[in-house]
């Protein structure tokens, strides 16, 4: 049996078996149901990475297909970073016939509580190739080297 799907469709059931874990033609009871595609869930669940460097907190959000005009970056209550956006449905023309609609429309919103050591007034955001980058600079702290003073023990 081949692990590569046949170009001739599912009519070729040579050596396929429902008990074979590698069979590609196992009956799927959910096959005909319409579930949201991964692209539509990508909007609703906007994936965000948050890393902390010595100088800043950096957030990167994957927002494929979104324009910067469709995205908002806000600071709420001087401590919460809010990234939100909304993609609108394309205008449908009367003479058009749609065969499949998989790209989603809708909105998303993500919130992150920021630590106290950040400069809220210097937050910067940029968007390139569907990736939003938000940089929140940290307050510079004067870290002094630990000074050790030897104490004489009397007695």
Swiss-Prot record:
Decide whether keyword Repeat is in the record. no
Cellular component per GO?
cytoplasm
**Which intervals hold domain sHSP?**
39-154
- Which GO biological process categories is it annotated with? cellular response to hypoxia; protein complex oligomerization; protein folding; response to heat; response to osmotic stress; response to salt stress
Q: Where located?
A: Cytoplasm
Q: Which InterPro entries match?
A: A-crystallin/Hsp20_dom, HSP20-like_chaperone, Small_HSP
What upregulates it? By heat and osmotic shock and salt stress.
Instruction: Give one Pfam family.
Output: HSP20
Chief subcellular location equals cytoplasm
- Keyword set, alphabetical order: Cytoplasm, Stress response
Q: How does it assemble?
A: Forms oligomeric structures. Binds to AKR2A.
Q: Which family does it belong to?
A: Belongs to the small heat shock protein (HSP20) family.
Job description of the protein: Possesses chaperone activity.
Name listed for the protein in its UniProt record: 17.6 kDa class I heat shock protein 1
